[in-house]
Amino acid sequence: IAKEASPYMIQRGRGTIIYTSSTAAYRGNKGQHSHAAAMGGRRMLCQTLNAQYASQGIHVTHILVDGAVDAPDTLGKMLGPELFQKLRETRGSEDGLLIPVEMAETYYHVATQHRSAWTHELDLRAYSDVAWWNHA
């Protein structure tokens, strides 16, 4: 993305590139070696791209989605209809799952920030989730 989009952004003197990763960008789970390496690599890619392009007006940011997204077409298919419905009933009420439209608002905010206060890394997590570093 950066390789293809950055020349146009450099020409304009501005632009935003947002990469999204999962929790595995910070910590790996048992049996997910390749996934953790890829997500961690994406996080580091954002840092190096930011170092390369920020002075040219290009904002590169990494958004970590650290939680279950209320998405029947993805999480629902992965879990199956019954388990997904149970998750919605137990954690989805009161906005306990990440809501896609609210996530989109956050992405929009990051994409339109003034360059004096760019966000370079951001975690999205529902209020009902306990951060992974606080688990007993």
Tell what function each PLM region has.
Residues 22:
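Residue(s) in the substrate-gating loop at a strand-loop-helix junction
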Residues 55-58, 62-67, 79-136:
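C-terminal helical subdomain
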